[in-house]
């Protein structure tokens, strides 16, 4: 499926006359930062264990900022594979009494509800996933959507913004912790590999790169 064909199918969601600054900035797409923690690398077979999403806002001067965070610990789907090495890497304890995990469907339904609210507020037609090595997060998101037969997915199915690539361009760093350090963003390695922490830091990094580009004259909004 070509991107143009996909976008044509979505055009009816937003008036062609919409001039909201966020919609203008990203061609009708709203950046939403997503991070997942999983039981392995295979989105079809391995468990989704945590998911977090941060919606992005824009101030009156056209600068981006992290707006609202959604975070869920997720129950592994029936028959899901969970590698011991993955649990050791993330530090997730599935039997922790305070884990309070919810189903994939419940987590995605609530996140998608919040994303659709943000889409409406910003005059955007579709969310675009922002992630650090974004294809990984998008793959697990799409797999969970398909597994739960969720019909209304606000995210573009294959396009994304990858902060590993953007940080490589802006700072010469592709590892999240090092990119944040180069961008003067505090990063605590002890908190890393929590979906919530990584998502919030990725959101700061993304906003910082986009805002820095604007300050350098690389983006002029329609009021300039």
UniProtKB/Swiss-Prot annotation:
Residues 1-20 are annotated as: Disordered. The record marks 41, 89, 136, 158 as: Important for substrate binding and specificity. GO terms for cellular component: cytosol. Mg(2+) 2 binds at residues 35, 37, 193, 198. Trims short 3' overhangs of a variety of RNA species, leaving a one or two nucleotide 3' overhang. Responsible for the end-turnover of tRNA: specifically removes the terminal AMP residue from uncharged tRNA (tRNA-C-C-A). Also appears to be involved in tRNA biosynthesis. Belongs to the RNase T family. This is Ribonuclease T. It comes from Pseudomonas entomophila (strain L48).
